[in-house]
């Protein structure tokens, strides 16, 4: 049985940014995930369910667990003195860690994706993304350090809190998964070099918004529902409403996750920096593909911390199909 810590040290030589700092950074995220796991499991017994009464910068009502997870991860990262600053979906601006100007890395995160599902005991997750800063080491970080395209990521991953808690990550050398053993307090390797199945047959989208979707996406959904034995259609529809949970299932089983633009969210709803980029990095490392329908997600240069983007991610041929439908059936 190999632990996450042992695996990270063993694999350091495989990537160009191998440093003790990155190992310690991933260890800090691991600690934050353990704390969140513990408190999610007893959320119904203590007063951390439901809305906090506050809103985040996007105008969305923050759940109590959103704020809890944000603070715990922030504290775990700051305590190691290896991160110069963070950007979070739950923070209006970047958070500069005083006294950590010497650090090489910045972290972007969605502390608790799908937190509205907690009240009904459905899987949620944590998403993280790590970059090397671009401003000189020894100076405070600036927003420039965070507004980098996804192809500059050093590492990315997620933790899914479900029937078991799993941490999945990449440093650009494949995707690896670890299951948390609460009796031992360690994450143990369960899958190495994960790959999307070559053929997918699941599509994940909130079809309740169908009337608001672009024409190409509507056509693609109909394509998924048509019967064609040569392409194993109709596909199966599965939608949890938690990006991490939907992505994880499709990674294991083969499929596509779709969150297109809508009439009410013409720029899309998912955040480029906190959700799209890390999941796109993982997808490509697992042999999949990620797109906004027209452009590779990892090639997009962000313009603002909380920028949104349409998002299509999963098995490569399925993402290519939806891109083709968007090209062939543009909105009038």
From Swiss-Prot:
Residues the entry annotates as binding Mg(2+) 2: 110, 113, 275
Predominant subcellular localization, coarse grouping: cytoplasm
Subunit and partners: Homotetramer.
Protein name in UniProt: Fructose-1,6-bisphosphatase class 1
Amino acids binding Mg(2+) 1: 89, 110, 112
Cell membrane listed as a keyword: no
Keyword Cytoplasm in annotation: yes
Catalytic activities: beta-D-fructose 1,6-bisphosphate + H2O = beta-D-fructose 6-phosphate + phosphate
Enzyme class of the recorded protein, top EC level: hydrolase
Family: Belongs to the FBPase class 1 family.
Enzyme nomenclature, EC number: 3.1.3.11
GO MF annotation list: fructose 1,6-bisphosphate 1-phosphatase activity; magnesium ion binding
InterPro entries: FBPase_C_dom (IPR044015), FBPase_class-1 (IPR000146), FBPase_N (IPR033391), FBPtase (IPR028343), Fructose_bisphosphatase_AS (IPR020548)
Keyword field: Carbohydrate metabolism, Cytoplasm, Hydrolase, Magnesium, Metal-binding
Record text on cofactor binding: Binds 2 magnesium ions per subunit.
One Pfam family it belongs to: FBPase
Swiss-Prot/TrEMBL cofactor(s): Mg(2+)
GO biological process, one term: fructose 6-phosphate metabolic process
Associated pathway: Carbohydrate biosynthesis; gluconeogenesis
Residues binding substrate, per UniProt: 113-116, 206, 239, 257-259, 269
GO annotation, cellular component aspect: cytosol
Gene3D superfamilies listed in its UniProt record: 3.40.190.80, Fructose-1,6-Bisphosphatase, subunit A, domain 1
Name of the gene encoding the protein in the UniProt record: fbp
């Amino acid at each position: 049985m190999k632990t996450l810590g042992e695996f990270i040290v063993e694999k350091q030589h495989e990537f160009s940014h191998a440093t003790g700092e990155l190992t310690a950074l991933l260890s800090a995220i691991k600690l934050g995930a353990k704390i969140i796991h513990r408190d999610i499991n007893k959320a119904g017994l203590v007063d951390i369910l439901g809305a906090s009464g506050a809103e985040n910068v996007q105008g969305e009502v923050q759940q109590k667990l959103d704020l809890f997870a944000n603070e715990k991860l922030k504290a775990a990262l700051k305590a190691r003195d290896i991160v110069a600053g963070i950007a979070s979906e739950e923070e209006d601006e970047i958070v500069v860690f005083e006294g950590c100007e010497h650090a090489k890395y910045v972290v972007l995160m969605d502390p608790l994706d799908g937190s509205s599902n907690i009240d009904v005991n459905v899987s949620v997750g944590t998403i993280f993304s790590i970059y090397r800063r671009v401003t000189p080491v020894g100076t405070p970080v600036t927003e420039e350090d965070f507004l980098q395209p996804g192809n500059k990521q050093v590492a990315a991953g997620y933790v899914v809190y479900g029937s078991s808690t799993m941490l999945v990550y990449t440093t650009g050398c494949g995707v690896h998964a670890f299951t948390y053993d609460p009796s031992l307090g360690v994450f143990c390797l369960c899958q190495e070099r994960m790959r999307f199945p070559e053929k997918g047959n699941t599509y994940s989208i909130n079809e309740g918004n169908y009337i608001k979707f672009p024409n190409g996406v509507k056509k693609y959904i109909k394509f998924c529902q048509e019967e064609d034995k040569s392409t194993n259609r109709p596909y199966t529809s599965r939608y949890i409403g938690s990006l991490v949970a939907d992505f994880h299932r499709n990674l294991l089983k083969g499929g596509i996750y779709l969150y297109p633009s809508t009439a009410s969210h013409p720029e899309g709803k998912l955040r480029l920096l906190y959700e799209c980029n890390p999941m796109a990095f993982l997808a490509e490392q697992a042999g999949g593909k990620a797109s906004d329908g027209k452009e590779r997600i990892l090639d997009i240069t962000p313009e603002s911390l909380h920028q949104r983007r349409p998002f299509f991610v999963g098995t490569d041929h399925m993402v290519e199909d939806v891109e083709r439908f968007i090209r062939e059936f543009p909105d009038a």
